[in-house]
Amino acid sequence: MSEYLLLLIGTVLVNNFVLVKFLGLCPFMGVSSKLESAIGMSMATTFVLTLASILSYLVNQYLLLPFDLGYLRTMSFILVIAVVVQFTEMLVQKTSASLHRALGIYLPLITTNCAVLGVALLNINEKHGFIESAIFGFGAAVGFSLVLILFSAMRERLAAADVPTPFKGGAIAMVTAGLMSLAFMGFTGLVK
């Protein structure tokens, strides 16, 4: 039980996919200008990452490995992710049309979010079992969500602040992301 908790904490804080592995930077920078959009994207990405991680494990274990189709791993994982994203988009559109409009193009772009594919591939490379795959996917999603929401809140405050002209927009966002990354480095010794 404790190894599962350590895996979760390690994935969320120590080995954060955005700040340490630099995966998922497109939605991190693109959706983080408004807190409402960031929260919606976080919920959608959490659902997609967790479900895609579990389904990718099942596809690998019960389809690719028994038939010696390891060379189709990346293609099959992309297909699994695309199906999960389409399901999520239909779910969001039916439950919250305003959130669907707010997320706009970023919801279908979860398919191309390298963090989602990265989690699926890292699960296989690190030889995680079913439970570890689910925890790893959920932890990566929670870490992504945590960073996205914190970054979004900071960007909203920076939009109202008196930022020097050369630093407005993307420049101050990159400086802020760098400072967040430094703050998360403080968790480095937490989990081995």
From Swiss-Prot:
Entry EC number(s): 7.-.-.-
Keyword vocabulary terms for this entry: Cell inner membrane, Cell membrane, Electron transport, Membrane, Translocase, Transmembrane, Transmembrane helix, Transport
Domain of life: Bacteria
Lipid bilayer topology: Multi-pass membrane protein
Compartments in which it is found: Cell inner membrane
Quaternary state and interactors: The complex is composed of six subunits: RnfA, RnfB, RnfC, RnfD, RnfE and RnfG.
Described function: Part of a membrane-bound complex that couples electron transfer with translocation of ions across the membrane.
PANTHER family listed in its UniProt record: INTEGRAL MEMBRANE PROTEIN OF SOXR-REDUCING COMPLEX (PTHR30335), ION-TRANSLOCATING OXIDOREDUCTASE COMPLEX SUBUNIT A (PTHR30335:SF0)
Annotated protein name in UniProt: Ion-translocating oxidoreductase complex subunit A
Provenance organism: Shewanella pealeana (strain ATCC 700345 / ANG-SQ1)
Gene that this polypeptide is encoded by: rnfA
